[in-house]
């Protein structure tokens, strides 16, 4: 009985500590700036290859990640919850952003004096509308806390096929769940599953001739979950088209 009482006391103490901390587990420290203008029009394109972020479904809640976070494009599509880490310019609350770009290092400047994206600094260069939800724009740069969160997306994963015969380049966008993709496979009606290799950003490539075949795609996210989208592209697909599949 005494052991049960002690365990109960310990459990209550742990819950009290959790409440006192606001349930704040999993946060890391970094910094944030902003770019792209008040309408985020300057954030279009970028190192993930998403192009027009409005039509691609990412909107203005986006961020360019420093090299330490970008992971050579493997972090494209990952979602982060960010909050201001202190100072008079901070605003209450958090904002969720999707990684859509790289914030390149500037080795001509010190990491704490303009070289915000220099390794090994974890930094978010956020679209201005996202930044101004957690801090006043006049701050320029603020310390932040961040953590990975699930991505909430509408509709299915999108596959945009470009390239040419024997070089299929597929841009994978609108990925829910973990958001960032670690593996993609493609299957034609006359072939088995073939692994695609990471090309750049959110683009994956394959060297098979898949012309004239219905195409299926299998996407694996960083959390290990996999979604298979069967026959999303009909046999008459052509390069430049986008097709929607399943979702996490």
Swiss-Prot record:
What does the record say about its membrane topology?
Peripheral membrane protein
Which residue intervals define the domain Expansin-like CBD in the entry? Answer: 166-245
**Where is the secretion signal located?**
1-22
Q: Which UniProt keywords apply?
A: Cell wall, Cell wall biogenesis/degradation, Membrane, Secreted, Signal
Q: Which GO terms describe its cellular component?
A: extracellular region; membrane
The record's function comment reads: May cause loosening and extension of plant cell walls by disrupting non-covalent bonding between cellulose microfibrils and matrix glucans. No enzymatic activity has been found. May be required for rapid internodal elongation in deepwater rice during submergence.
What is this protein identified as?
Answer: Expansin-A11
Q: Which organism is it from?
A: Oryza sativa subsp. japonica (Rice)
């Amino acid at each position: 009985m005494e052991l049960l009482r002690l365990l109960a006391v310990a459990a209550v103490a742990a819950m009290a500590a959790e409440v006192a901390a606001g349930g704040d587990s999993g946060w890391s420290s970094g910094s944030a700036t902003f770019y792209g203008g008040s309408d985020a029009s300057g954030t279009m394109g970028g190192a993930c290859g998403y192009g027009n972020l409005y039509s691609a479904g990412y909107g203005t809640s986006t961020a360019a990640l420093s090299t330490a976070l970008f992971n050579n494009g493997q972090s494209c599509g990952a979602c982060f919850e960010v909050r201001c880490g202190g100072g008079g310019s901070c605003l209450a609350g958090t904002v969720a952003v999707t990684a859509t770009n790289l914030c390149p290092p500037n080795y001509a400047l010190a990491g704490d004096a303009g070289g915000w994206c220099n390794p090994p600094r974890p930094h978010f260069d956020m679209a201005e509308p996202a930044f101004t939800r957690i801090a006043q724009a006049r701050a320029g740069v603020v310390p932040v806390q961040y953590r990975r969160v699930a991505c909430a997306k509408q509709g299915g994963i999108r596959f945009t096929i470009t390239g040419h015969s024997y070089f299929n380049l597929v841009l994978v966008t609108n990925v829910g769940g973990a958001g960032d993709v670690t593996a993609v496979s493609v299957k034609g009606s006359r072939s088995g599953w073939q692994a695609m290799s990471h090309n750049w950003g959110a683009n994956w490539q394959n060297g098979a001739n898949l012309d004239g075949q219905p195409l299926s795609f299998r996407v694996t996210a960083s959390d290990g979950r996999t979604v298979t989208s069967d026959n999303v592209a009909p046999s008459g697909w052509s390069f430049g088209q986008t097709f929607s599949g399943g979702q996490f």
